[in-house]
Swiss-Prot record:
Name of the protein described by the UniProt record: Small ribosomal subunit protein uS2
Entry keyword Ribonucleoprotein: yes
Gene it is expressed from: rpsB
Annotated organism of origin: Wolbachia pipientis subsp. Culex pipiens (strain wPip)
UniProt keywords, alphabetically: Ribonucleoprotein, Ribosomal protein
GO annotation, biological process: translation
Entry's family note: Belongs to the universal ribosomal protein uS2 family.
Length: 271
């Protein structure tokens, strides 16, 4: 049974998910997800009865990828999302981009990988107690390291392009959406009333500006991913505990196979 986190329409309303943008800024493609207009403020009100099943489907998609040991990339570079995206991605052992999206981050992965190797090399140089470099040279390397770490620190351990993207504000992250489409990578995206739902495999209609709303989306995403990882671990334990019987001197002995990385993955789940 899928153990996904529970969420209600009340939870969505309390987090301000239903508040859209000014009517003048809307994208007509979002009409199916809009309940009406707040007459005093002239903003669209998002229909949370539509949002809830979309959110549940999106969280199930993240769960499924995590349960198959897939890579999940959180993307949110707007000010309100920076720290939330990073902390929730780290909490569930996944990856994030929260500074700016570098063109080619997906479609030119080899170059990005090379930059990550450079970052690691800089760190080795700076940590070398026997370095013969001058203080000025080390200072220049530290500046370069900081820049690379800010841009790539959240994906340095990813190892390959992700299996799915989780994006806050698909308008702002339109380059990420475009690159994902080119590579056939599905996108879970939070879509406000000014967004374009095209090319988003798992749309979540909702406020993409409110910090409280962003916290809710990211927490649910991380919890769904952790549930998927736990599901994967459970399956691994079942396979692990298949008994292999050996006869030695007429005595049946029982051995258990152990996964090499189980300890590390359990640490991730416990975070």
């Amino acid at each position: 049974m899928t153990n996904l986190p529970k969420v209600t329409i009340r939870d969505l309303a309390e987090s301000g998910v239903h508040f859209g943008h000014k009517v003048s800024r809307w994208n007509a493609k979002m009409a199916p997800y809009i309940y009406g207009v707040h007459q005093q403020n002239r903003i669209h009100i998002i229909d949370l009865r539509k949002t809830l099943p979309l959110l549940e489907a999106a969280m199930k998609a993240l769960y499924d990828v995590a349960s198959q040991d897939g890579r999940i990339l959180f993307v949110g570079t707007k000010f309100q999302a920076l720290d939330i995206v990073a902390s929730e991605a780290v909490r569930c052992g996944q990856y994030y981009v929260n500074d700016r999206w570098l063109g080619g981050m997906l479609t030119n992965w080899n170059t990005v990988s090379s930059s990550i190797k450079t970052l690691i090399q800089y760190e080795k140089i700076l940590n070398d107690e026997d370095s013969i470099l001058t203080k000025k040279e080390l200072g220049n390397i530290e500046k370069k390291r900081k820049k690379l770490d800010k841009e790539l620190g959240g994906i340095r351990e990813m190892g390959a392009v992700p299996d799915i993207l989780f994006i806050i504000d698909t308008n702002k992250e339109h380059i990420a959406v475009k690159e994902a489409k080119k590579l056939g990578i599905p996108v879970v995206g939070v879509l406000d009333t000014n967004s374009d739902p095209d090319d988003i495999a798992y749309p979540i209609s909702g406020n993409d500006d409110s910090r409280k709303s962003i916290e809710l989306y990211c927490k649910l995403a991380a919890d769904s991913i952790l549930a998927g990882i736990e599901s994967s671990l459970t399956r691994s334990r079942v396979k692990d505990d298949e008994l292999i019987q050996e006869k030695e001197g007429g005595i049946v002995q029982t051995k258990k196979k152990r996964m090499k990385d189980e300890t590390e993955r359990e640490v991730i789940v416990s975070k």
